[in-house]
């Protein structure tokens, strides 16, 4: 069907709203990527007296005081990590960083990722052939057709590589939560206007992964026009005070799960696990990337696709905090897992393995147990953050679901109210049963 003329579009705001909501396909989209080359970070006065904003486009230009506001040991927003992700960026990803000043003193900061979210490409189940009865197949085709035109240029306040609140930090001794969130929203709006001046027009803003129990920030964001929606829980294993060794952890299990763990260890004896240094990661770079894609390609929902050089860039930037462990069968790398030390917690980062070997060697389950052992005996942290996906098997090793909420705001007011419903409609559903290896379930 021939699209309406330009004259008609100019006379019909609703038509323009619809067109901006359904962004064009990749082939049609000729808008340039944001320009990160010029990073003079001009200071902008905000609406609150004495408060100013600096927008940086590269982590290398962030001042040293950026790290000073972070909680002790926080790595996901550190300059070291941010520089590493820029050296090996995810496909189609750009970055921006906000610094908030009050009376010339830094009182807040936010790390943003800029990407185009293409629904059909990033939700695997929509790409598959429909199954089920006639109505189920019809519903699948409707969702697929709708999703094929549901594309957004997003400012993501947070980190798509992780689950959890790695979006912003504010000094709450100088700002109350409502004031902090008002500044965050104003800063993100300033960023959107700055990007539009470069030729990259954002359709919406996503602030990701606030904990359900956090009552201050969500309320403030809703007052700013954001709508919250739950999106798959973060699986977290908190350690008990009397767990000093991995054996202590095993002894706390009920018999059924302890037997299961020992059975997995027995199956895993056919593999050799070794920590990989920078040289080994570089040597195995192709294999690591292939193994990562073996698993990432099977995930129903993927917000990003890592580049081949990501693991090496991270190891070079954070040699002590970032660790990679390889699993070998007869000197052939068949799997790997990675961890990132983040203050009082150990983050289970990306992993990969040969799916056809998983059952015989209980490869994935052994990786989970190994990360628990490392967290207890080597890193000596308080918890392991296992992130999203594979919820049931993670609960079988003791991880508990922590509800996370994302907050979204479409920059077109016509569709802002409808967006949360669309997100819930398209969200992949994972049916699972929580396990209780320590009893009480």
Q: What spans do the regions from the language model cover?
A:
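N-acyltransferase acceptor-side catalytic subdomain
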Residues: 1-441
């Amino acid at each position: 069907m021939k699209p309406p003329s330009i004259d008609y579009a100019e006379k019909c705001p609703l038509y323009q709203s619809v067109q901006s909501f359904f962004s064009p396909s990749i082939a049609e989209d000729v808008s340039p990527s944001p320009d990160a080359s010029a990073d003079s970070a001009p200071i902008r006065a905000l609406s609150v007296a004495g408060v100013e904003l600096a927008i940086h486009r590269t982590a290398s230009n962030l001042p040293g005081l950026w790290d000073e506001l972070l909680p002790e040991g926080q790595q996901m927003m550190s300059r070291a990590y941010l520089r590493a992700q820029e050296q090996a960026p995810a496909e189609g990803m750009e970055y921006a960083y906000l610094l908030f000043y009050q009376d010339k003193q830094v009182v807040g900061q936010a790390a943003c990722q800029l990407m185009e979210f293409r629904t059909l490409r990033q939700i695997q189940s929509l790409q598959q052939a429909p199954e089920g009865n006639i109505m189920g197949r019809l519903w699948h085709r409707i969702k697929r057709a709708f999703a094929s035109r549901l594309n957004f240029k997003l400012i993501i306040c947070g980190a798509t590589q992780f689950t959890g609140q790695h979006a912003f930090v504010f000094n709450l001794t100088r700002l109350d939560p409502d004031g902090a969130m008002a500044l965050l929203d104003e800063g993100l709006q300033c960023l959107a206007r700055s990007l539009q001046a470069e030729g990259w027009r954002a359709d919406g803003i996503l602030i990701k992964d606030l904990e359900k129990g956090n009552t201050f920030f969500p309320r403030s964001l809703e007052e700013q026009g954001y709508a919250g929606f739950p999106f798959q829980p973060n699986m977290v294993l908190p350690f008990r005070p009397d767990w000093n060794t991995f054996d202590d952890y095993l002894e706390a299990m009920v018999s059924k799960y302890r037997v299961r763990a020992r059975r997995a260890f027995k199956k895993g004896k056919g593999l050799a696990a070794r920590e990989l240094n920078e040289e080994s990661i570089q040597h195995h770079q192709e294999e690591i990337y292939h193994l990562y894609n073996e698993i990432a390609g099977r995930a129903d929902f993927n917000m990003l696709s890592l580049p081949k050089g990501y693991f090496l860039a991270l190891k070079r930037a954070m040699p002590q905090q970032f660790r990679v462990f390889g699993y070998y069968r007869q000197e052939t790398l068949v799997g790997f897992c990675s961890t990132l030390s983040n203050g009082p917690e150990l983050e289970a980062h990306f992993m990969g393995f040969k799916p056809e070997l998983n059952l015989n060697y209980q490869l994935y389950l052994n990786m989970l147990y190994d990360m628990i052992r490392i967290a207890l005996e080597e890193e000596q942290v308080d918890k392991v953050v296992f992130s999203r996906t594979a919820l049931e098997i993670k609960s079988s090793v003791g991880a508990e679901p922590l509800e996370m909420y994302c907050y979204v705001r479409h920059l077109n007011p016509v569709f802002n109210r409808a967006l949360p419903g669309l997100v819930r409609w398209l969200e992949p559903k994972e049916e699972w049963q929580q396990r209780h290896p320590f009893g009480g379930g």
